[in-house]
A protein has these predicted regions:
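Boundary at the C-terminal end of the N-terminal hydrophobic targeting segment
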Residues: 25-27
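Short, well-ordered surface patches within globular domains
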Residues: 29-114, 159-166, 174
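A well-ordered secondary-structure block
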Residues: 109-184, 221-222, 236-250
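Beta-strand-enriched, solvent-exposed domains that form extended recognition/catalytic surfaces
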Residues: 190-269
Length: 269
């Protein structure tokens, strides 16, 4: 289980100044991130030695919401971008035989969600499981019970702040690899953000019709916490170095107060 479901709080009038006092964020190299995105989309189109099981995935959602109802937590809604991130990681683990939240290259759930859920602003988390029964096919309740009986995984199942989920289940003969991608969705873009951009103004345009409105944002290295402030509505955008970045929108949480969310990964060319 992994979770980065956290948002940094900024005082509105001090948001730019406070972030500028932090160490300067560095862009990640662009080509590895572009290659990872291609790899994930290729796995979605052609899963290795098996197929994605949509019925299994939907049953996991039903079982998860049953657990949440018993705990007094609101139900989770299905999100196709989160489901894409979950499916892609399940297939990637099947290829690499590395069953972890981090790939060998160090790509995290935040990076996967940022690459594939391109209209989502939120705080992601992830559960993973692999199972092969001695007799009979693996069932959804067996995977859900594995997570329910693990404190860390259970925390993601019942976290009241999470609003959306996508499950990815790859069935390879008797083996099932399952991934749950969870998020507290704080905002939606009107459409998918572009992966490749020429400047911060293109990202600002992608945010222009977000709901609720996003009028300023920072960026970090994908999955990173060190920020560079690049845009405040009505001010000229700051210069940003080429490379891979992750959008960190400033979400209003009251008068003159903002929280930093997690948004799409983009490559500045």
């Amino acid at each position: 289980m992994t979770s980065i479901a956290r948002r940094t709080l900024l005082a509105g009038g001090l948001a730019v100044a406070a972030a500028s006092l932090a160490p300067v964020a560095l862009a990640a190299p662009a080509q590895p991130w572009l290659a990872y995105e291609r790899r994930l989309r290729g796995l979605l189109a052609d899963p290795p030695d098996g197929d994605f099981d949509e019925d299994f995935e939907q049953t996991l959602l039903d079982l998860n919401n049953l657990i949440r109802r018993r705990e007094g937590a609101p139900p989770l809604a299905w999100d196709p971008g989160l489901a894409a991130a979950a499916r892609a990681h399940a297939a990637d683990m099947a290829v690499t035989e590395r069953f972890d939240h981090l790939t060998r290259e160090g790509y995290s759930p935040a990076g996967r969600v940022g690459l594939l859920a391109r209209d989502l602003v939120g705080a992601p988390a992830e559960n993973i499981a692999m199972r092969r029964n001695a007799d009979g096919a693996v069932r959804p309740d067996q995977i859900m019970n594995q997570w329910r009986d693990s404190p860390g995984h259970r925390a993601n199942l019942v976290a009241p702040s999470f609003t959306h989920v996508g499950y990815g289940v790859l069935r390879q003969g008797p083996r099932v690899i399952a991934v749950g991608a969870y998020a507290e969705v704080a905002a939606r873009l009107a459409g998918p953000a572009p992966l490749r951009v020429r400047g911060p103004d293109e990202i600002a345009r992608a945010l222009s019709n977000a709901a609720p409105p996003i009028r300023q944002f920072s960026v970090s290295e994908p999955g990173g916490e060190v920020l560079t402030v690049t845009y405040v509505e009505g001010r000229p955008p700051n210069v940003l170095r080429p490379g891979a970045w992750q959008l960190r929108p400033h979400l209003s949480s009251g008068e003159h107060r903002y929280q930093l969310g997690w948004g799409p990964v983009f490559v500045l060319e």
